[in-house]
From Swiss-Prot:
This is Particulate methane monooxygenase alpha subunit. It is a multi-pass membrane protein. It catalyses: methane + a quinol + O2 = methanol + a quinone + H2O. It is an enzyme of class 1 (oxidoreductase). InterPro entries: NH3_CH4_mOase_B, NH3_CH4_mOase_suB_C, NH3_CH4_mOase_suB_hlx_hairpin, NH3_CH4_mOase_suB_N. Binds 3 copper ions per subunit. Two of these (copper ion 1 and 3) form a binuclear cluster.
Amino acid sequence: MKTIKDRIAKWSAIGLLSAVAATAFYAPSASAHGEKSQAAFMRMRTIHWYDLSWSKEKVKINETVEIKGKFHVFEGWPETVDEPDVAFLNVGMPGPVFIRKESYIGGQLVPRSVRLEIGKTYDFRVVLKARRPGDWHVHTMMNVQGGGPIIGPGKWITVEGSMSEFRNPVTTLTGQTVDLENYNEGNTYFWHAFWFAIGVAWIGYWSRRPIFIPRLLMVDAGRADELVSATDRKVAMGFLAATILIVVMAMSSANSKYPITIPLQAGTMRGMKPLELPAPTVSVKVEDATYRVPGRAMRMKLTITNHGNSPIRLGEFYTASVRFLDSDVYKDTTGYPEDLLAEDGLSVSDNSPLAPGETRTVDVTASDAAWEVYRLSDIIYDPDSRFAGLLFFFDATGNRQVVQIDAPLIPSFM
């Protein structure tokens, strides 16, 4: 019996080791949507991205892609997130698969951080250049000091070609044209290898003798002063002197070779020009709002008043990059990411045209699997369970008005 048990244990161990070893031969590509891990309230109550467009879905190495649209800095900015006094327009992607050539807010070039005003809407444009082949999920993103990255909608872009074809030429202020992709690459490799060798030599010197147990015994015996000999001190001083000398000489050589240098530019750009949007002629009051967990749907009771001159209908509800549409009123033609677009996800109890001067209370339901897929339903577990978003109203000629809403959200488990 013991022999059988030993054989079972032996073959079980061999099988386990074989299975673990086999995993080394299978390494699938990682694919993830990082925005799902960001708190729902962050995506709902900070930056609202809309009217987005990606100029291309397939490019070759060295070709450019332009992302443009608008973003609204939500008036009900959460207290737990620092206000966007220092913000940076960024792009979320898996590493340097593209390089950013240009970034604009309000038509102004923004190579560094900017100050944004709460309650304002800005247009933006980012130009990217394809660097690495593959299928990449490219997001809009706003980095806020003290608030972290606020992720926006993302779209898959296919890059074709070979990375060896990539070029990133720039002309310096002295008139020299260089390729930043491989500029002074040999010099970079040399200094990395050089200081690595210095580090290995330093570690090698101190580890040439027994390291742990004998030295521990000497410390316990009260002979710690004997661990470092006079020769050790001389060698250490030699390493220190050589390091200082090399740094000084290398710096002097670099200053001589490149006499004209400009430091990296920092500081916060102010005076970003928001869009001058006309005040909406529609007012909306949220009477109550509930999220029905089993149905993956949010229901809102809205009181809508039309102060304008033409009848209007509700065509879209936007929150946290997810768009819920009433296809009878509005259809998307921008190529918005399909996983973030619920083309028939918006239903209104009475969505007949709301006449000028008329007030109507309606039940609005936004339903789609995106509530769970993108973890927006997690908002009901927050200590400040509030939702926020944008409502888009349209008249018969297609003119649009945007109204933001913000209200407590009550969960329903029935």
